[in-house]
Regions:
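Glycine/tryptophan-enriched, flexible segments
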Residues: 77-218
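Residues forming well-ordered secondary-structure scaffolds
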Residues: 23, 64, 68, 149, ...
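A generic structural signal for short
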Residues: 16-17, 172, 258
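Short amphipathic alpha-helical segments, especially helix-boundary/capping motifs
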Residues: 4-5, 131, 159-161, 172-178, ...
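Active-site-proximal binding-pocket segments
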Residues: 183-184, 188, 193-297
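Mid-sequence acidic-hydrophobic segments that form the walls
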Residues: 31-34, 157-160, 225, 272
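Beta-rich, aromatic/charged-enriched effector core domains that present basic-aromatic interfaces
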Residues: 2-143
Length: 297
């Protein structure tokens, strides 16, 4: 369809935002080559650093460490930097962000229930018809679908949740799968929220009195891990998807889909993902991901 449209209008250049996956970029490259036209790829505004910038940063380094890339970006954009040094004298306050859920003195605020508009309801019906067996239950759908509403969710996080985000970001609770997590990543990933604006808003909360360990930990998730993993992806692809460092061969067990296992941590992580279509990074890293690593999957 795209090829036909380009020929019909005699276009000489195809301009696109940098795709999110290598396959799409390859397809666009092959298409424009076949048509004999130029391909102009613009940086993806959903990310702060470009694939080209990350490649330049990585060049010549024996090992690529997220922490060092994160520090480099902090300096570049002057985030939590005073007199060319990190605020608080440290780059990373993770040592303060591993508090047990048993130490929690207050329940997390109730998340406001979002009433879907007519268009969202129509889309939800289509999703149920086509993807009814996939993870997620539409009865639990509680996501904003406009920029204005996504910004309201960001403000709710900064006003009600960020103070406890840091200490309890690695904690898990059977009765509350989201705790003090921001739930903002989907909005950033689809372009409803600008990552740098969210980082600046978080930094502002620090100067208004929010704990540094919470603010720094939150910023690191976006400026550090999100940017670093994306950079690694584009640096290593297409070979990256077929790498198997540990040479593991076991397949995922059935309970990764059903949640039916006596291991309660795994069962609850899978069950909440099935219900919400969402899983925060500790569920993924320390439960399902860690199980897969230890089980040689």
């Amino acid at each position: 369809l795209l090829s036909k449209y380009i020929r019909l209008n005699n276009y000489e250049v195809l301009e696109v935002v940098h795709p999110s996956d290598h396959k799409t970029l390859t397809q666009l490259t092959l298409l424009t080559s076949k048509l004999g036209i130029a391909l102009k790829v613009h940086d993806d505004p959903k990310f702060i650093s470009s694939a080209y910038e990350f490649k330049n940063w990585a060049e010549g380094k024996k090992s690529l460490v997220q922490e060092f890339f994160y520090r480099w970006l902090r300096k570049k954009y002057n985030i939590l930097i005073e007199d060319e040094k990190p605020v608080g004298g440290e780059w990373n306050f993770d040592s303060k962000n591993r508090v047990s859920i048993n130490k929690l003195k207050e329940d997390p605020p109730e998340r406001e229930k979002i009433k879907p508009d007519a268009l969202s309801v129509d889309v939800m019906v289509d999703v149920e018809n086509v993807f009814g067996n996939n993870f997620g239950d539409l009865e639990n759908f509680n996501w904003s679908v406009t920029r204005e509403d996504a910004e309201k969710k960001a403000n709710e996080f900064f006003n009600s949740l960020i103070n406890n985000f840091g200490p309890f970001q690695d904690a898990m609770d059977v009765g509350n799968p989201t705790l003090f997590h921001s739930l903002l990543s989907p909005y950033i990933n689809v372009g409803l929220l600008d990552p740098m604006k969210i980082i600046v808003a978080a930094e502002k909360k620090y100067y208004e009195g929010a704990p540094l360990n919470s603010v720094e930990g939150f910023i690191r998730q976006i400026l550090g891990w999100r940017e670093f993993i994306r950079g690694i992806y584009w640096l290593k692809m297409p070979d990256y998807k077929s790498l198997n460092f540990f040479e593991n061969t076991r397949k995922l067990p059935e309970f990764f889909w059903t949640g039916e296992t006596r291991m309660q941590c795994v069962a609850k992580a899978v069950e909440s993902t099935k219900e919400l279509g969402y899983s925060h990074h500790i569920h993924r890293l320390m439960v399902t991901g860690n199980f897969a690593l230890l089980s040689e999957i």
